[in-house]
């Protein structure tokens, strides 16, 4: 069944609920109140028999005591394993920023029943960014800018995320206001997808209105971002012909390009003008930045998201994270496997392709900065996930009995939380609970992302969360079209506050979006408002 059929099925269900209310029955829950935030008590420091202390000023040759702390989590993990005990233990992190150059890996060899947490009252950050300074003043496009040399090493250290004072800075975009419109989608050169050709055709070229194309100094640094249907396309430029308006890209679109589809250009040197904007020149290996009020070349320190992932837990058990801030990661284009490369090698544009086409729905193939897979009892409490450029936290296939409690997710590039399993009945991913979390400004890079996305999982609770300011759906549960058996069931979606989503960019969304038959699933006590779909003639559903 196609997505449109599912959409109308959802509409019928909604109308039935609104206009054909069932006879009053005893509620599943006695009283529901949307999002009453639970305060978390971080407790006091008590050094246990098997505990260790880590500090940015420590030394991995130390014994890990309070007066002689270690320096890295890697060394703490080694000592925990060497201990050979399974009694409860804690690794206490003293205040500071821990730059994660290599992904922190946990597996079956790591000791169980260990909590990695912040020292009470201290701020602990695990960061995926490196510091950039040493700016000098210059002029770009008639405005004052700062410039510094950066080592890119080809593509190895190229970055697309930049942070300052805890916030994400914007790459230079064109135009500054509104959107551009596709003049001609060149559908004659497109390749039809596997089904529903009105939606799924793939393009490596389109024609812009010629007057909309700036004189790009470095066209191959530029990205075309198309917003249409329920998908935003990230299409790096391969070539531009201003005489005809033709633009070719290195990724094929996931969905059909149409006349008047909205798009913008990102990472445009000629558009660099507003305070806080930046542009990375690949050929010169220089970073340009338009200063904000109070900046000087000497005091400006920026942080480039060069590492995309921070933590990976596979076959782990009994590992807890408490009071840790995961921050400032980078991103790259998704090399899609779901759609892959739809163009045959004989196609004249095949030579352009550098990445496979990603799944068009819900930022499904975007990786996670923190990943948990085939693991049990991996818990996050009172943690902060901020300025994460990919999906922040993913519980992947065969993750079970995991809790995320009283955590904050802010300025997330894709999905804030993604719970995913194999399409088997019963689902292998089970009992993942998200409670008392605050999710804000998700989908900042991959706009079709979800606040909480759940696909193919069983017996999970999504309860008492506040979710707002995303470009797409707040909570999505299902991932199975039609009326066949569904591995997603027994899900509680209760007492969530969901608002200010959509914001007029994409279509086919909802505060809560469900698919397929889901026995024992309960949706109750949620408050949803300010849901807005694409405002153009193409917009619907939201």
Q: Where are the language model's segments positioned?
A:
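Sec-dependent signal peptide recognition
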Residues: 2-10
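Extracellular polysaccharide-degrading/modifying enzymes targeting complex plant/algal/animal polysaccharides
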Residues: 29, 38-41, 45-374, 379-384
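Extracellular, surface-exposed repeat architectures
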Residues: 116-117, 126, 260, 267, ...
């Amino acid at each position: 069944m196609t997505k449109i059929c599912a959409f109308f099925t959802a509409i019928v269900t909604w109308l039935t609920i609104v206009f054909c209310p069932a006879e009053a029955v005893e509620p599943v829950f006695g009283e529901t109140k949307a999002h009453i935030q639970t305060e978390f008590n971080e407790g006091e420091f008590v050094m246990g028999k098997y505990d260790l202390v880590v500090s940015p000023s420590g030394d991995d040759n130390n014994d890990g005591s309070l007066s002689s702390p270690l320096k890295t989590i890697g060394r703490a993990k080694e000592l925990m394993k060497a201990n050979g005990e399974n009694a409860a233990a804690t690794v206490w992190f003293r205040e500071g920023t821990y730059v994660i150059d290599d992904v922190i890996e946990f597996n079956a060899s790591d000791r169980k029943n260990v909590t990695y947490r912040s020292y009470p009252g201290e701020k602990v950050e695990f960061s995926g960014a490196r510091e950039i300074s040493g700016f000098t003043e210059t002029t770009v496009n008639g405005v004052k800018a700062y410039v510094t040399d950066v080592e890119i090493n080809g593509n190895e250290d190229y970055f697309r995320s930049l942070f300052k004072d805890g916030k994400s800075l914007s790459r230079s975009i064109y135009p500054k206001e509104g959107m551009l419109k596709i003049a001609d989608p060149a559908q004659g050169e497109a390749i039809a997808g596997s089904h529903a050709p009105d939606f799924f055709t793939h393009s490596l070229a389109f024609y812009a209105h010629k007057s909309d194309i700036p004189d790009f100094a470095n066209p191959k640094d530029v990205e075309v971002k198309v917003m249409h249907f329920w998908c935003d396309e990230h299409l790096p430029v391969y070539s531009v012909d201003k005489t005809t308006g033709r633009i070719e890209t290195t990724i094929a679109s996931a969905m059909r390009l149409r006349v008047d589809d909205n798009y913008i250009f990102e990472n445009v040197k000629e558009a660099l003008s507003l305070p806080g904007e930046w542009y990375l020149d690949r050929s010169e290996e220089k970073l340009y930045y338009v200063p904000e009020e109070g900046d000087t070349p000497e005091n400006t320190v920026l942080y480039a998201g060069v590492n995309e992932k921070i933590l990976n837990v596979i076959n782990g058990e009994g590992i807890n994270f408490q009071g840790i801030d995961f921050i400032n990661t980078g991103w790259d284009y998704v090399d899609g496997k779901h759609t892959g490369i739809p163009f045959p090698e004989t196609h004249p544009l095949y030579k352009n392709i550098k990445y496979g086409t990603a799944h068009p729905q819900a930022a499904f193939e975007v990786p996670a900065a923190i990943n948990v897979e085939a693991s049990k009892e991996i818990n996050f409490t009172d943690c902060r996930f901020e300025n994460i450029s990919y999906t922040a936290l993913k519980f992947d296939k065969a993750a079970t009995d995991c809790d995320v409690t009283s955590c904050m997710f802010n300025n997330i590039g894709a999905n804030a939380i993604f719970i995913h399993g194999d399409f088997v009945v019963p689902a292998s991913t089970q009992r993942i609970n998200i409670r008392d979390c605050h999710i804000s400004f998700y989908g900042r890079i991959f706009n079709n992302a979800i606040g909480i996305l759940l696909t193919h999982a069983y017996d999970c609770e999504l309860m008492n969360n506040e979710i707002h300011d995303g470009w797409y759906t707040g909570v999505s549960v299902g991932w199975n079209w039609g009326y066949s058996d569904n591995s997603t069931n027994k899900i509680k979606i209760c007492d969530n506050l969901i608002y200010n989503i959509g914001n007029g960019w994409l279509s086919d969304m909802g505060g809560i979006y469900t698919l397929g038959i889901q026995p024992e699933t309960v949706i109750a006590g949620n408050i949803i408002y300010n849901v807005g779909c694409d405002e153009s003639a193409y917009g619907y559903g939201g």
